Amino acid sequence: MPNTTTTNSPVPVRHWLRIIVRSVFILVILLAAAGFFYENISEARDRRFHPMPGQRVDVGGYKLHINCTGQGAPVVVLDSGLGDSNVSWMKVQPQIAKFTRVCSYDRAGLGYSDNSPRPRTSKVMAEELQTLLQNAGISPPYVLVGHSMGGYNVRLFASLYRSEVAGMVLVDSSHPEQEKRFPQALNDMDKTWVREQEFMTLAMPFGIPRLLGFCGSDAKVRAADCNFHSYREGLTELKTFPEGAAETATTGSLGDLPLAVLSHDPNAPVSDIPADLVKPMNDAWEQMQDELAHLSSRGTRTIAKNSSHYIQLDRPEVVVEAIRNVVDQARQLQSERNQSAEQK
């Protein structure tokens, strides 16, 4: 018999690479699917246990969410900062409702509001707010309260609908020249922030921000804010922020409108900005806040001690007191006008 030997040829490396790539691909698909279901179940759970307060009102083919409490006039209208929903006012609205009617709302695409087909500029947001108030049957006069970017919106509202506005409170409001006056290194950080927000928006449908703890521990906040459409709208507002600044720069004086300007404590610790940028940033901010207070001959300015940018969360009593003072001034001025009209 012939001498024969059997040789087992090795499996090519390419074969094993294909197996590994396929396995990784399948694993990624499974993890993405698991994250997708986790996110959707979590959103549904949060909103089931914390249902939407207030109502949704049609403003021209899409609906915006508004929540009004209390009674009396003028009506206080709360406009949140960039990417924030109505829940940013949760510590102040119940207190304001004790002395007048107060409404918080969600801009289009945020919280419980639908997306809008219109450009996301501050002028458009002011127009949408006026339509929302009108369609919801909430009559002027209004005391407008704007936090951060919301300050642009309420100033544009006052410019467009001056006869409907009885007073204004600016809560650490943005200034239309802030990007020009801040250190360039700080503006460069904004570009990094945009990239981070783009990643978070893409990751949101798969539950990654929630898993990383970015949604927070308050279920009421999660129900309104922790969802894909809110993250996407926040990113859009971030990208159109310069347009809002340019629009606001065209608005003029507020005349003798009752005005309160609240500013964060420049000595409060700042964790997300390099130490060498904090002082020049705060110096510029202080000057710009003074300029905001001088928009009206009745303007006042208060620094909220031990408060960050979110004064309404850190020092809600300061915000409530400022709003109360402006409401009282507006009522007094209206009373004087009524008496003057009766004497004629």
Residue ranges, per PLM feature:
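Conserved catalytic-core motifs of eukaryotic protein kinase domains, centered on the activation segment
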Residues: S88-M90, S113-P119, K180-R181
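Flexible "cap/lid" subdomain of the alpha/beta-hydrolase fold that forms the substrate-access gate
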Residues: S122, E164-H294, G299, I303
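Active-site loop/oxyanion-hole signature of alpha/beta-hydrolase fold enzymes
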Residues: N67-T69, S104-V145
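Conserved hydrolase catalytic core segment
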Residues: S139-F182
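Conserved HGGG/HGGXW glycine-rich cap/lid loop of the alpha/beta-hydrolase fold
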Residues: Y62, C68-Y112
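Catalytic active-site module of serine/aspartate enzymes centered on a nucleophile-bearing elbow/loop
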Residues: R14, R22, S296-K344
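Alpha/beta-hydrolase fold catalytic core
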Residues: P2-P74, K98-T100, D328-K344
